[in-house]
Amino acid sequence: MAKSSQRKQRDCVNQCKSKPGLSTSIPLRMSSYTFKRPVTRITPHPGNEVRYHQWEESLEKPQQVCWQRRLQGLQAYSSAGELSSTLDLANTLQKLVPSYTGGSLLEDLASGLEHSCPMPHLACSSDAVEIIPAEGVGISQLLCKQFLVTEEDIRKQEGKVKTVRERLAIALIADGLANEAEKVRDQEGRPEKR
């Protein structure tokens, strides 16, 4: 009887103890510093002031190395909501910067991008002049050699897919037969109970 009352007391004490993650004390940053540093809690209510150390005020915000990668795959729309094509790019840039007197606006923009984010140079071709007729050849990011897919390439790929599917079908049939044979062996090894 005494043991059960001691257990009840112990259980009550354990329930009354607070959980380690729900502490109301100021949390301490556990790091390689000799002294533990207090952590500023940021709560999502308005009017909360976030305190900074003096050395934190002089820190610069991190910058993205290649910001234009975020823009890949995005479509440009006009103010009317119509999809803009790549052929309108040169005209749009000329409208935005009508007083520009340099050689080629797109070349200067692309060279600025290349200096801000070094990317591997792609194979250039004169076919890209057809994409942007108003601009010259020399923009490495916009003048990529086109990859043409021929009917022969499609037929070769279809043949490869067909042979792989046939091999997969044969493998599935063989696996099913092996499973059935294993079941038969298991049933022969154990006599049936009646």
From Swiss-Prot:
Region called Transcription repressor, residue ranges: 1-104
Keywords: Nucleus, Repressor, Transcription, Transcription regulation
Record carries keyword Repressor: yes
Signal peptide: none
The keyword Nucleus belongs to this UniProt entry's keyword annotation: yes
Gene Ontology molecular function terms on file: methyl-CpG binding
Gene Ontology biological-process entries: DNA methylation-dependent constitutive heterochromatin formation; negative regulation of transcription by RNA polymerase II
Tissue distribution: Highly expressed in testis. Detected at low levels in pancreas. Not detected in the other tissues tested.
GO cellular component: nucleus
Main localization, broad class: nucleus
Free-text note on domains in this protein's UniProt record: The N-terminal half of the protein mediates transcription repression.
Extra remark beyond the main annotation: Does not bind methylated DNA.
UniProt record similarity statement: Belongs to the MBD3L family.
Role noted for this protein: Transcriptional repressor.
Name used for this protein in its record: Methyl-CpG-binding domain protein 3-like 1
Native organism: Homo sapiens
Gene: MBD3L1
